[in-house]
């Protein structure tokens, strides 16, 4: 891996072509193209994201600038690394660490052999990175499986990288955030209620991610966004059989400490690191093989690849959160050399087994659309929840 990372912030007149060879395209977004690149002197492989200045608004450019400032602050083994930035008249170039393993769910499905112990190791890495972000004044605000990339070549232990800081925010001590943003299946209840919030929203998302990693489907699911949001606000979830049979009580307790309506009672990342489920050294202790979770993840990946995603913006109200379509500028997204990231956006379908008939694979689809607060008045509460998660 490239050594961290001395070159951030080239002079404006530096030309990227003097330092990097451009390779094949590995991703594309509304305003950007991502190519694999090679450093001319060192031979290091990188991902180069070229953002066209001609096609972005002043507000978008401010957002990209904010994202760059955030990524410059973060140097952690479980966070994708920004190497350097080039600024030309027509393009803003972000040179990033190249992640070869693709999205985490894809890697789990490909591997085929997956246990609760593996899930625990993955969650431990995520919590470690989020603890670091929060200690450095960064709230991610859009943690979800699609923003977790896998870079480990060692089959014994996958290395998770958190990506996509397009919705992230630097906050000062005691500051409260107000912008309604996130992805429906993973969004915290205080955001849906338009209440001020803090980094605890990331911890709610980790609770949802942990749940999915252990069973393959989301804790909250419904046919419409309105119903989905109401289930989140009512904390309407359980651990249905047979998917949760054999999974340890410690794992369930860990999730229960995060899926708490009151953010003041929700565990912090520092508390989670010390939770027995993460802190305990499992050693060679056998934990349940999560074959059913892999099966559900296969459906998740297959349905995502078969769909085309929208970006949705949310207008949340205290009583009835509403979702409506809007033309939107995508987040700066995950960079990976895997084929799963070669589309502009992917729909990710969380297939959820109804607890009233656990052996029946009639799954409800939950739509994970990126949501940002706006003032449009078009309500789409009757849209089906097909998981729309954007990756460039």
UniProtKB/Swiss-Prot annotation:
Keywords assigned by UniProt, alphabetized: ATP-binding, Kinase, Nucleotide-binding, Serine/threonine-protein kinase, Transferase
Organism (species): Dictyostelium discoideum (Social amoeba)
Sequence similarity: Belongs to the protein kinase superfamily. CAMK Ser/Thr protein kinase family. CaMK subfamily.
Presence of the UniProt keyword Membrane in the record: no
Biased composition regions of type Polar residues, renumbered to the chain: 317-326
Matches recorded under InterPro entries: Kinase-like_dom_sf (IPR011009), Prot_kinase_dom (IPR000719), Protein_kinase_ATP_BS (IPR017441), Ser/Thr_kinase_AS (IPR008271)
Lineage: Eukaryota, Amoebozoa, Evosea, Eumycetozoa, Dictyostelia
Gene Ontology biological process: signal transduction
Xref: CDD domains: STKc_CAMK
Molecular function terms from GO: ATP binding; myosin light chain kinase activity; protein serine/threonine kinase activity
SMART domains referenced in this protein's UniProt entry, alphabetically: S_TKc
Annotated region (Disordered), positions in chain: 317-392
One Gene Ontology cellular component annotation held by this UniProt entry: cytoplasm
Biased amino acid composition, Low complexity: 327-392
Sequence ranges assigned to domain Protein kinase in this UniProt record: 20-278
Sites where the protein binds ATP: 26-34, 49
Keyword Kinase recorded: yes
Coiled coil: none
Pfam families in alphabetical order: Pkinase (PF00069)
PROSITE patterns from the UniProt entry: PROTEIN_KINASE_ATP (PS00107), PROTEIN_KINASE_DOM (PS50011), PROTEIN_KINASE_ST (PS00108)
Domain of life: Eukaryota
Protein's job: May phosphorylate a specific serine in the N-terminus of a myosin light chain.
Protein name: Probable myosin light chain kinase DDB_G0271550
